[in-house]
From Swiss-Prot:
The active site is at 246, 280 (nucleophile). InterPro entries: Ald_DH/histidinol_DH (IPR016161), Ald_DH_C (IPR016163), Ald_DH_CS_GLU (IPR029510), Ald_DH_N (IPR016162), Aldehyde_DH_dom (IPR015590), Aminobutyraldehyde_DH (IPR015657), PatD (IPR017749). The gene is patD. The keyword Amino-acid biosynthesis does not apply. GO terms for molecular function: aminobutyraldehyde dehydrogenase (NAD+) activity; NAD binding. This is Gamma-aminobutyraldehyde dehydrogenase. PANTHER family: ALDEHYDE DEHYDROGENASE-RELATED. The keyword Transmembrane helix does not apply.
């Protein structure tokens, strides 16, 4: 098992405290891995700074060629990545292999092409005797913090655009889920020049703070909780670093009475519970028009009850465990508080699964009110709430009355209504008659407390650049 940091092109053991890494499907410890010490964090940042002097001046073609080599290496090692992601996260192996690893490779391929297509404003004479032009230059050293729900995918979302734009990166995976990142490290060591990517490991409170607060770091990119984002913003405020934040969500799913109910049920069964609901865009906050409310509640409850939980290596398993005992207890707390409300009905699920592992039953809670905690706060587990609504104005108000602003969906056969709602919803993405669909060519990112900045797409590439004006007198 790979467990080494990557610093200045070399794979080295951490010199700090050993952290336990667990298999969520069994609750058993699978490794004890030494985190970096503060000297190693400093060495990683300085290696990135040194490498940037050359890497930042390479041609897009050069960078694209190496990104394509990374994509090839990921595909060639797909089974190894899927095994580690399943072991460390509890994900069904077939989902990691068939859904996530191909998407990771595709992100590197997309940004390999995007690196060669970055455009700027037209040059021109805006002042007599002077010619102006616009450059998009790399930011410099980027500190990237990846989350535990999609360790490999989120690492790719951060590495690919940053490298394509000519930046150097110091990446820290979540302390709970480092295994695929360590495996990636040994591949990157063979492909990239020394120092272009460095990987450190450790707790956020010490290693994360040391990394993001380092004076040589020019930009911090985080996917994580609102609390973590707020902490990093406060921690880095004095150095005025550029920041890129994706901080979670509570996606409203608006179902009108003209929607295809079978399509809705099939979609929410998948999109609300993929990755055990541990997804910032999960279809978790349903608003259903009153005329079809009872029908949707019954059909969705029946469908969700058929989701199969269990062994991640069983090809029929659809739902894995939560990531840690702590996360499981958090989900239990949300559901127990919701169950205590007299107006909420547990349609299916609602309990921790007895036995080994951190499993929670896929859960549908009906009768939730707009002000309920279960409607307002991100649970990050296999739990959806359903609330009836009467008309467009009411549901738009309810959907937007949230601190989050990442993802949303509208289910209707009325194309005019779909356009009206898409124009009004305050979310970074609105899907119509689907949910949870992501492609490398389109941006992903939020507003409000869900953060700012875009992953994927040309917008994601631009986020890792600085716009500069060059004026020449002649």
């Amino acid at each position: 098992m790979h467990d080494k940091l990557l610093i200045e092109g070399k794979l080295v053991a951490g010199k700090g405290e050993a952290l336990a890494v667990f298999n969520p499907a069994t609750g058993e410890q699978i490794a004890a891995i030494a985190q970096a010490d503060l000297h190693q964090v400093d060495a990683a940042v300085l290696a990135a700074e040194s490498a940037f002097a050359h890497w930042g001046q390479t041609t897009p073609k050069t960078r694209a060629t190496l990104l394509l080599q990374i994509a090839d290496a990921i595909e060639e090692n797909a089974e190894a990545f899927a095994r580690l992601e399943s072991l460390n996260c509890g994900k069904p192996y077939h989902a990691a292999l068939n859904d996530e690893v191909p998407a990771v490779a595709d992100v590197f391929r997309f940004f390999a092409g995007a690196a060669r297509c970055l455009s700027g404003s037209a040059a021109g004479e805006y002042l007599e005797g002077h010619t102006s032009m616009i450059r998009r230059d790399p930011v410099g050293v980027v500190a990237s913090i990846a989350p535990w729900n999609y360790p490999l995918m989120m690492a790719s979302w951060k590495l690919a655009p940053a490298l394509a734009a000519g930046n150097c990166v110091v990446l820290k995976p979540a302390e709970q889920t480092p295994l695929t990142t360590f495996y990636l490290a040994h591949l990157l060591a063979e492909i990239l020049p020394a120092g272009v990517v460095n990987i450190v490991f450790g707790r956020g409170a010490d290693i994360g703070d040391a990394l993001t607060g380092h004076e040589k770091v020019n930009m911090v990119s985080l996917t994580g909780s609102i609390a973590t984002g707020a902490h990093i913003l406060s921690h880095t405020a004095s150095s005025v670093k550029r920041t890129h934040m994706e901080l979670g969500g509570k996606a409203p799913v608006i179902v009108f009475d003209d929607a295809d109910i079978d399509q809705v049920v099939d979609g929410i069964r998948s999109f609300g519970f993929y990755n055990a609901g541990q997804d910032c865009t999960a279809a978790c906050r349903l608003y259903v028009q009153r005329a079809v409310y009872d029908k949707v509640v019954e059909a969705l409850g029946n469908a969700v009850a058929t989701l199969k939980m269990g062994d991640p290596h069983d090809e029929t398993t659809e739902l894995g465990p939560l990531i840690t005992e702590q996360q499981l207890e958090r989900v239990v707390g949300f559901v127990e508080r919701a169950k205590a409300l007299p107006h909420i009905t547990v349609v299916t699920g609602g309990e921790r699964v007895k036995g080994q592992g951190f499993y929670f039953q896929p859960t549908v809670l009906a009768g939730a009110k707009q002000e309920d905690e279960i409607v307002q706060k991100e649970v990050f587990g296999p739990v959806i709430s359903i609330t009836p609504f009467d008309d467009e104005a009411q549901v738009i108000g309810w959907a937007n009355a949230s601190h989050y602003g990442l993802a949303s969906s509208v289910w209707t056969r009325d194309i005019g209504r779909a356009h009206r709602l898409a124009a009004c919803l305050q979310y970074g993405c609105t899907w119509v008659n689907t949910h949870f669909m992501l492609v490398s060519e389109m941006p992903h990112g939020g507003q409000k407390l869900s953060g700012y900045g875009k992953d994927m797409s040309m917008y994601g590439l631009e986020d890792y650049t600085i716009v500069r004006h060059i004026m020449i007198r002649h």
